[in-house]
Amino acid sequence: MTENATAGNGTWEDVFTNRDSHHIAMSGDEGKTWYGFREIILDEHRNHPGYATLDGPEDRGKHQSEMVQLDKNRILISLGQHKNHRRLVIVDRRWVGAKTRATQTGKDSDSQWTIHTYIPQKKGHCSYNRKPSAELVPDPSGSTKKVLQIKRLNDPELVNEKSNVDYRNAGAAWNFPNGTTGLVKFRFRAADGDQADDSGLQVSLTDRLFNACDSTTKDYALFTFPIRLRPAPHLLLGMKKAPFTPGAWHEISLLWQGGQAVVSLDGKKAGTLKMANKSPNGASYIHFISTGSQPDAGILLDTVNARVK
C-alpha cells in the first residue's frame, strides 16, 4: 500500500497490514512448480474497529505457522500470534488442489472476502484500527439477497494528511486456486446515486493478496482494467471502450492464458488485455477498488466464479 511515513520508526518496524490471512501451496515435483496458493483462514477479528488493541497491545495476526502431517491427505497446521488469533487448522491436500471456487458477496463477505480499510494512525504493536471498506446493501433489482457496494467513501478519519495517505477508496479482494490459465466471471452493476467524473472500479487479477484499500494494486497486477461510469458507462480495455447500460446487472468474464486475457461482457468478446506483470504461479486473486476521487455511489458486486487449469 501507499507508505505511511509516520507509522514506522524509520528503521524496520512500521505497521503490519499483511497478517489477516494465511496461505498454503503444495508441490508435486520437489518444488519445481506449486499449486493452490489458497487462503486456509482469514482472521476472525480483521473487521473489528478496535483491532489494534483488542484484548491487549501485544503483537497479533494470522502468521507464523508450524505443521504436522496427519495422514496421506491431511495436515495439521498451528498458526497465528496472540491468544485470540492462534488457531489449529486441518487442511486436506485435495482441497488445496481444487480447480474451482464460487462466491455470492451477500452470503460470503465474512468468510471469504477481505473488505476492510484502515485508520492510518499506528496503534498498539504495529497495527491500525479498521473500518468497513466495501459494505453490504440490498439488491436494487428487488431480490431478497444483499450485494457488495464498492465506492469512494466520505470519511476524513481514513486520511493522514501529514503522511499524504488516503484510504477512502473502498475495495474488496477474493482468493481462488491459482492458475496460469483460467476463467473468472463476476456480476456487477452501477449503483443508483450520484457519480463523479472519475467514478468507477479498477479490476485486477493478482498472484497474491493486496489490501482492499490498496490503490497501487493495479501497478503489480497480472491483468488490470477499469470500469468507467462517466460520461457513459463502459469498460476501458486498452484503447477500446465496451459500453454497458446502467440500472441492470451485467457479467464480465476474464479468460487468461499465457500473456493474454480475453475480456467478455454479457457473453460477447469486448477486448483483450496484455499481461502487465509476469508470475510463475499465475493468478490467485481478483481485486476490486473504487477509482473515484470524490464521494460517489460506486458499483455493486454480486457473484464471482473461478475455474483454473
Residue map of PLM features:
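Secretory/extracellular carbohydrate-interaction modules
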Residues: 144, 150-232
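Short strand-turn-strand beta-turns centered on an Asx-Gly dipeptide
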Residues: 264-269
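Extracellular beta-strand elements of beta-rich domains used
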Residues: 91, 107, 252-254, 302-306
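Localized edge beta-strand/strand-to-loop motifs within extracellular or lumenal beta-rich domains
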Residues: 248-262
